[in-house]
Design a protein with these regions (language model features):
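Conserved AMP-binding/adenylation subdomain of ANL enzymes
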Residues: 198-278, 293
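AMP-binding/adenylate-forming catalytic core of the ANL superfamily
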Residues: 87, 93-94, 104-106, 389, ...
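Structural core segment of the AMP-binding/adenylate-forming
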Residues: 47-48, 75-156
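Conserved pre-ATP/AMP-binding loop-to-beta segment of ANL
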Residues: 152, 159-179, 186, 222-230
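Conserved AMP-binding/adenylate-forming core of the ANL superfamily
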Residues: 18-63, 67-71, 88-93
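AMP-binding/adenylate-forming catalytic domain of the ANL superfamily
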Residues: 130, 505-526, 546-551
Length: 552
């Protein structure tokens, strides 16, 4: 036995086979059914020549079959490649070739894109197609018949292969890979040992005291002894946080509610229908429309006792609304990245200091470093780059240059340093400021977009915002904002900044604003800064303020 995703899930199968593991409207899987389907699919992968360490792509929205595919890949000791279902052809080509993908499991609605990219991915030899809820018309079948004919039907792979669990012993050293979102460059595959990722994302370390959990049966035993927890991971499974919400549910005999699309009112209907206990979201992109939906219509949310956000900005003004609406629930804001895993969390209270980004209690292996690699002491007001030691990734897949830049050794200690800047608060907590690669250098001052975005969203008419730097003859760059407002409102930039200046210094406030209908974000809710820069370059600002000679 090993600290391995497939092993943990199998423990739950053995203790609770008749429990429902996965559920959506009109369909479900018990643990026994999940086990049988995943075993059969894993045998199909082996029949296609997949060996331990080979890469298998999953190109799907959140579906029951997507979860079965992930579990099957781990059972076969292969390495899963998470494929963003919103990628255009050039992005798909990059991830197919960069990952050296040998098999792709995809939803039929993506056939046209797969057909166009397949000739450019020489190592991708086999396809397994999942039927989806998008109609399959005759024209599409004729147009892409050469591809669909070569693809194995997902249902056939399950029906025509052994459902026995007769795989070789797995290892702590089996690999888990997570491709980054690519919001600041090409997506990169972050390669982890399974034991390491278990320690930081799979519950293998107590997040409050740092004590390792070494009993591999603990989650299954605890689950079998207690009631069933119902989790609803809303973000796409291309996002690591959402994957791990499902895996942890399956480790402990819980039930994961699975839906392919996000809708604010739909979310609360699902919560009500499935009596959801824990909701997983990614920041304001989901939190704002969800809380607005609750203000528009009353839903039964009495089953909810926790709402957890990760991977994207969760503004304090929005958190306050959740605390008001869910006074007895735990509202959690967690930080981390593909390169670090869990970095810290905070239980939200109303009226917390708004300055900066998320403020969390860091885990024991997270520190702040200066540029020379020395550790900033707790209590210092210096801004440093966040770094994690202990259980961290091995490397980026196929990118030794980037690996050397991110995974560094200082004074004999190996760190993962993805580039997020932060500072300590007087109580030892860490306030996140943002990714250095998108920071704005204005007159020698480094300004982090996330803390400005949070301040802008405190204005009642601002629904969403992305902050970028634009060229400025005097200061090099000036802070600018692309803003989506509520209900067609058009607040003045002066009024927006008046609210923002209650949380951030004046020199951090935007001097120009571009209004748009919606802010483009990744499926995981992260802002697309390249898109924001493109908006500022495509047309004149809707409003620009004069820059004073004295900045405060």
């Amino acid at each position: 036995m090993a600290y391995n995703i497939a092993d943990f899930i199998e423990h739950a199968v053995d203790l609770m086979p008749e429990r429902t593991a996965l559920e959506t409207d009109g369909d479900a899987r018990t643990y026994a059914q999940l086990e049988a389907d995943a075993n059969a699919l894993a045998h199909q992968l082996r029949a296609l020549g997949i060996a331990p360490g080979d890469t298998v792509g999953v190109y799907s929205r959140n579906t029951l079959e997507c979860v079965e595919a992930m579990v099957a890949i781990f059972k076969a000791r292969a390495v899963m490649v998470n494929v963003n279902f919103r990628y255009v052809e050039s992005e798909l080509e990059h991830i197919f070739t960069d990952s050296e993908m040998k098999v792709l499991i995809y939803e039929r609605q993506f056939t046209q894109k797969v057909a166009k990219v397949l000739p450019k991915a020489p190592k991708l030899k086999h396809l397994i197609v999942i039927e989806d809820d998008v109609s399959r018309d005759i024209a599409d079948a004729l147009n892409h018949g050469h591809l669909t004919a070569d693809a194995i039907e997902f249902t056939d792979a399950i029906a025509n292969n052994s459902t026995e669990r007769d795989f070789e012993e797995r290892s702590n050293d089996d690999l888990y890979m997570l491709y980054t979102g690519g919001t600041t460059g090409h997506p990169k595959g972050v390669v982890w040992r399974q034991e390491d990722v278990y320690r930081v994302l799979g519950g293998g370390t107590d997040w409050f005291n740092g004590v390792p959990i070494d009993d591999e049966w603990k989650f299954a035993n605890d689950g079998a002894a207690g009631g069933q927890l119902v989790r609803f991971p809303i973000p796409p499974f291309i996002h690591g946080g959402s994957q791990w919400a499902v895996f942890q549910a399956l480790y402990g005999g819980g039930k994961a509610i699975i839906y392919p699309e996000f809708g604010a009112h739909q979310t609360w209907e699902i919560v009500e229908r499935h009596t959801v206990n824990v909701i997983f979201i990614t920041g304001d992109a989901m939190a704002r429309p969800m809380i607005d939906a609750l203000l528009e219509k009353d839903y039964d949310t009495s089953s909810v006792f926790s709402i957890a956000s990760s991977a994207a900005l969760f503004s304090q003004s929005v958190k306050d609304q959740y605390v008001d609406r869910f006074p007895n629930a735990m509202i959690i804001d967690a930080i981390g990245s593909s390169e670090t895993g869990f970095g810290g969390l905070a239980a939200i209270t109303k009226g917390a200091d708004h300055a900066g980004g998320p403020r969390v209690k860091a885990d024991p292996n997270t520190v702040l470093l200066r540029e020379d690699g020395t550790v900033i002491p707790v209590g210092s007001e210096e801004v440093g780059v966040m770094a994690r030691t202990g259980n961290i990734p091995l490397r980026y897949y196929n990118d030794p240059v980037k690996s050397d830049k991110t995974f560094k050794v200082y004074d004999g200690v190996r760190y993962s340093i993805p580039g997020d800047f932060a500072r300590y608060e007087s109580d030892g907590a860490i306030t996140m400021l943002g990714r250095g690669s998108v920071s704005i250098n204005s007159g020698g001052e480094k300004i982090y977009p996330e803390e400005v975005e949070q301040a802008l969203k405190a204005h009642p008419d601002v629904f969403d915002a992305v902050v970028v730097g634009v060229p400025d003859e005097r200061y090099g760059q000036r802070v600018s904002a692309v803003v989506a407002t509520r209900d067609g409102a058009r607040p003045s930039l002066a009024s927006i900044n008046e609210v923002a200046r209650t949380e951030i210094a004046g020199y951090k406030c935007p001097r120009s604003v571009w209004f748009v209908d919606t802010i483009k974000r990744s499926p995981a809710g992260k802002p697309d800064y390249r898109w924001g820069t493109g908006i500022t370059e495509s047309r004149e600002a809707d409003e620009t303020l004069a820059v004073s000679s004295t900045r405060v």
